């Protein structure tokens, strides 16, 4: 097990072992993911484009500031801005069959796709979710496609909570469905997945 860290600026590195790295100030990670060196790391851009990279390819460094830019270790480009980073086992069969990835955009579009549809490590980027013009991806989460609830929260303090099974799984190139109606000046700023009681 190792830790994969990514800064706000997009510097990425991995630790040599499973000791959680200590960071502070400019060296603090925006994303910190625990993974096996055999896992696949997914970098997801705000545009909905994504890249899959074998964890062992990510450069090892003592400090995140010594890492490499995400677009140097993946097929994403320097024009991409990261929205999420997550890890999956290289053998997706190790996950429950119904495991899904849930994406949410700032305009409230929500989509669920089976992780079995995600490609493995490749030199090509792929579309995780179709993001409409002017919109951007804000959240990516994993769920079991069964007993969870989804909470969306907006900048103006509105919220909606609904059952996960209200959203059916769709293919990777789909844009998704409208998760909530928004006021013209409002936008979704957060999405969480909760277990039901």
Walk through the language-model features, giving the residues of each:
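Short, structured "edge-of-domain" segments at secondary-structure transitions
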Residues: 1-197
């Amino acid at each position: 097990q190792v830790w994969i860290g990514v800064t706000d600026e997009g510097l990425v590195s991995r630790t040599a072992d499973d000791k959680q790295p200590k960071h502070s100030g400019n060296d603090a990670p925006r994303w910190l993911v625990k993974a096996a060196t055999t896992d696949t790391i997914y970098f997801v851009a705000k545009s909905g484009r994504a890249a899959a990279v074998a964890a062992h390819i990510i450069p090892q460094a003592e400090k995140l500031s010594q890492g490499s830019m995400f677009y140097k270790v993946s097929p994403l480009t320097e024009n991409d801005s990261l929205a999420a980073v997550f890890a999956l086992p290289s053998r997706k069969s190790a996950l429950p069959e119904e495991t899904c990835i849930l994406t949410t955009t700032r305009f409230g579009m929500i989509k669920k796709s089976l992780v079995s549809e995600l490609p493995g490590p490749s030199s090509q980027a792929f579309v995780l979710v179709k993001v409409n013009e002017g919109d951007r991806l804000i959240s990516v989460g994993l769920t079991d496609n069964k007993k969870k609830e989804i909470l969306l929260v907006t900048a103006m303090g509105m919220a909606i909570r609904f059952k996960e099974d209200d959203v059916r799984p769709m293919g990777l190139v789909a844009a998704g469905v409208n998760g909530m109606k928004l006021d013209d000046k409002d936008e979704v700023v957060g999405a969480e997945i909760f277990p039901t009681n």
